[in-house]
């Protein structure tokens, strides 16, 4: 869940873990992403701990760290959008779980990758 929330948001913002943790409103956005992911897991009968705040605070130990998705983007490599975001989106659709924040994140991140590759 954490990777799905921090990877794409770091690509969209260019921010490190520490910068995202300090940014007003970012914890709320990432928390919504993780909540939606948790709802999808529950819809499939997967019991995951509801420890979103604890998971989000893990970035405080590595403030200068760039998530792997941002590292891939900056290096011009293909990002892991499909296994990290698209899969959750497809699972949500199959169970008709509303995931508006994940849908928005997917559209923005996929577009950013297409635009970068076009350059």
Model-identified regions with their sequence ranges:
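Active-site-proximal catalytic alpha-helix in oxidoreductases
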Residues: 1-21, 25-38, 64
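NAD(P)-dependent Rossmann-like dehydrogenase/reductase catalytic/cofactor-binding core
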Residues: 27-119
């Amino acid at each position: 869940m954490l990777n799905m929330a921090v990877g794409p948001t770091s690509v969209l913002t260019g921010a490190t873990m520490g910068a995202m943790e300090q940014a007003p409103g970012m914890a709320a956005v990432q928390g919504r992403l993780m909540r939606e992911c948790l709802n999808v897991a529950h819809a499939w009968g997967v019991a995951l701990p509801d420890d979103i705040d604890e998971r989000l605070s893990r970035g405080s130990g590595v403030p200068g760290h760039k998530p792997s998705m941002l590292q891939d983007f900056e290096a011009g490599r293909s990002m892991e959008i499909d296994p990290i975001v698209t899969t959750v989106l497809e699972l949500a659709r199959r169970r008709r779980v509303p995931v508006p924040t994940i849908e928005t994140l997917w559209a923005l991140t996929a577009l950013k990758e297409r635009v970068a590759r076009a350059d």
